[in-house]
Amino acid sequence: MGCCGCSGGCGSSCGGCGSGCGGCGSGCGGCGSGCGGSGSSCCVPVCCCKPVCCRVPTCSCSSCGKGGCGSSGGSKGGCGSCGGCKGGCGSCGGSKGGCGSCGGSKGGCGSCGGSKGGCGSGCGGCGSSCCVPVCCCKPMCCCVPACSCSSCGKGGCGSCGCSKGACGSCGGSKGGCGSCGGCKGGCGSCGGSKGGCGSGCGGCGSGCGVPVCCCSCSSCGSCAGSKGGCGSSCSQCSCCKPCCCSSGCGSSCCQSSCCKPCCSQSSCCVPVCCQCKI
């Protein structure tokens, strides 16, 4: 017997699910028999008759270990004990869409990397709708992200293969990383900024990818400068951390310990230093 008082689905015979049905209200119909399907009028997610999430979401990396996976499945509504993420979360590498066993994905993944969509037949290519993060057959990033400082040492670099090459100490970025750590000219532990680097890894140009070690170490302090432009104020010391501050984030976005999200509200940050979701 389930929350609707029936054993064969949340159809009309259940009376639309009552207050004991996880807060879904009268719109909790439309689930197929067995309550695992997702009908057109299903809540997102809906606990029907037995604790199964009918629709999205699956586990996401950000929700794993924060009550999102396991106890509540990272759902958009109160689901109580209905958690599971359509097949169980495991180590949680999944995505905001249907992921099968959450970490598995569109083609079978393993330790997860890849992108949200648009992967070619070999799961290494990128289509126009590529974003982050769904597993694609093997752990490599189709488009974004490469390694970020916050993910390094936490499965983001190395085991998760979140760049197209070895990440080293991980100073990466949101864009394609090439060998991720190479710094186009040899820069040591890699970090730098979004500007281009000359062959000596000291001068700034405009066409270089990221990450690159930008500007000289003549006046360092504690990691100065900004993410764009690379003017004379963009001094980067041998620490080679990504620049602090990003356009659009305001002065509150500056932190001396660069390798962290830098927004004043943590919910608006992404795991790239001082890159904000506006």
Curated annotation (Swiss-Prot):
Tissue specificity of this protein: Expressed in hair root but not in skin. Expressed also in lung, pancreas, ovary, testis.
Keyword Repeat: yes
Key word Repeat present: yes
Sequence repeats: 42-45, 48-51, 130-133, 136-139, 142-145, 239-242, 258-261, 268-271
GO annotations of cellular component type: cytosol; intermediate filament
Keywords recorded for this protein, A-Z: Keratin, Repeat
Segments of this protein annotated with the region 8 X 4 AA repeats of C-C-X-P: 42-271
Subunit architecture: Interacts with hair keratins.
Family under the similarity heading: Belongs to the KRTAP type 5 family.
Protein name stated in the entry: Keratin-associated protein 5-1
Species annotation: Homo sapiens
